[in-house]
């Protein structure tokens, strides 16, 4: 969802220093001490202030394929795979066959009573959980739902509860297990302190009590949910929030053509050279040198940031992240078929209901096709390892 609380749906400001020192507003319950796990939760109570219709999303007709991909030619390769792409020669990863245990964590925050209140995030959790159970064999007792309409304090999406649930999600995961993480709420950016971001900003998400207890930064989400995973474990993540393109800090990013994205040095060079030409026209030789030096410094800094990410943020596990927008974009809090919803969450479910036998590139294009008629945001696919987007079918 766009911006962060209090910024407005189309705001472009960053979250640096934001959300500190404010008292929590409405609906916050302190976490219970000594909580050691997540028992099965009852369905969340219906406290929607906007009256969503019964029955959930209105989707396009589905293809009838409930069993999912079966063509062996499109199944994930088995065994350890080499990274390549400039990674150290001893780096290897393993695709998950997604035949093992399934666990899911879904978070939806409407920020009731707070500035920047949203409408569709809780609906996203309800609809995504139903979709997982209907089409991907997830069980309700293996899901944790955190929404800010919950009566149980442990089901509120506070910072402590979210962090605890992230640890629960990955604990004990084994090869070929399939884990699912979904976040629908406010997202933003804050200054990058460890040098792993090309644009100088880390991506963050905002718990319901962020004013009192702060946001959660992408470096920490990677530490808690990606680093503990062993080879062959799948984590599928969906971020329906602003500035979420690399919200899990995964180093391999793909476009709709399936090509690995690199820093756009040609574009940066154009800006740098334009400044140099303008300075030369004014007779400002010092300005020429400054413009060219500035470009060279920026290019070197971008390369350093990407090299650091490639060294520190890869994983032997099979981690895929679908994001509602690029790092510099906002995401839409939409109304579809009279129901408030996150546009990315709706598009993801709609694309898979229509056809589950899609490669990663086909699915990314399907999601963008659903969105592009009404929204400017461009969803993004990122991965913890090199991904054969053209030939391997999406599974989870």
Swiss-Prot record:
Q: Which InterPro entries match?
A: Caspase-like_dom_sf (IPR029030), Metacaspase (IPR050452), Pept_C14_caspase (IPR011600)
Q: Where is the composition biased (Polar residues)?
A: 72-81
Show the Pfam families listed in the entry. Peptidase_C14 (PF00656)
What EC designation does it have?
Answer: 3.4.22.-
Chain positions covered by the region annotation Disordered: 1-86
State the active site.
186, 242
Instruction: State where composition is biased (Low complexity).
Output: 47-62
The organism sits in which domain of life?
Answer: Eukaryota
| GO BP, sorted A to Z | apoptotic process; proteolysis
Q: Does the keyword Hydrolase apply?
A: yes
Q: Which family does it belong to?
A: Belongs to the peptidase C14B family.
Give the function comment from the record.
Involved in cell death (apoptosis).
What protein does this entry describe?
A: Metacaspase-1
Which species is listed as the source? Answer: Pyricularia oryzae (strain 70-15 / ATCC MYA-4617 / FGSC 8958)
The encoding gene is: MCA1
């Amino acid at each position: 969802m766009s911006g962060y609380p209090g910024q407005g749906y189309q705001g472009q400001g960053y979250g640096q220093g934001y959300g500190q020192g404010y008292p929590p507003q409405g609906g916050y319950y302190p976490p219970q001490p000594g909580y050691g796990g997540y028992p099965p939760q009852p369905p969340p109570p219906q406290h929607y202030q906007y009256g969503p219709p019964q029955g959930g999303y209105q989707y396009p007709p589905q293809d009838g394929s409930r069993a999912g991909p079966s063509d062996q030619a499109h199944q994930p390769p088995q065994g350890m795979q080499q990274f390549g792409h400039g990674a150290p020669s001893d780096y290897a990863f393993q695709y998950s066959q997604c035949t093992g245990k399934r666990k899911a964590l879904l978070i939806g925050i409407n920020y009731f009573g707070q500035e920047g209140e949203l409408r569709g995030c809780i609906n996203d959790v309800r609809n995504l959980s139903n979709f997982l159970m209907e089409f991907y064999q997830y069980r309700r007792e293996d899901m944790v739902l955190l929404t800010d309409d919950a009566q149980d304090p442990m089901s509120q999406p506070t910072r402590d509860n979210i962090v605890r649930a992230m640890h629960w999600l990955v604990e004990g995961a084994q090869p070929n297990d399939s884990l699912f993480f979904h976040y629908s709420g406010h997202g933003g950016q804050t200054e990058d302190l460890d040098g792993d971001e090309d644009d100088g900003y880390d991506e963050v998400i905002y718990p319901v009590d962020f004013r009192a207890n702060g946001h959660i930064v992408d470096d920490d989400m990677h530490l808690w949910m990606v680093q503990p995973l062993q080879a062959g474990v799948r984590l599928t993540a969906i971020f329906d929030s602003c500035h979420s393109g690399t919200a899990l800090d995964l180093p391999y990013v793909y476009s709709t053509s399936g090509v690995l994205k690199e820093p756009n040095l040609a574009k940066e060079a154009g800006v740098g050279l334009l400044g140099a030409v303008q300075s030369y026209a004014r007779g400002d030789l010092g300005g020429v040198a400054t413009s060219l030096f500035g470009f060279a410094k920026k290019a070197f800094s971008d390369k350093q940031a990407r090299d650091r990410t490639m060294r520190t943020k890869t994983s032997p596990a099979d981690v895929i992240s679908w994001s509602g927008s690029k790092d510099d974009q906002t995401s839409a809090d939409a109304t579809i078929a009279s129901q408030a919803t996150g546009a990315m969450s709706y598009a993801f479910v709609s694309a898979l209901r229509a056809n589950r036998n899609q490669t990663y590139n086909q699915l990314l294009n399907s999601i963008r096709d659903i969105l592009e008629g009404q929204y400017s945001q461009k969803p993004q696919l990122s991965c913890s390892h090199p991904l054969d987007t053209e030939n391997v079918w999406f599974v989870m």
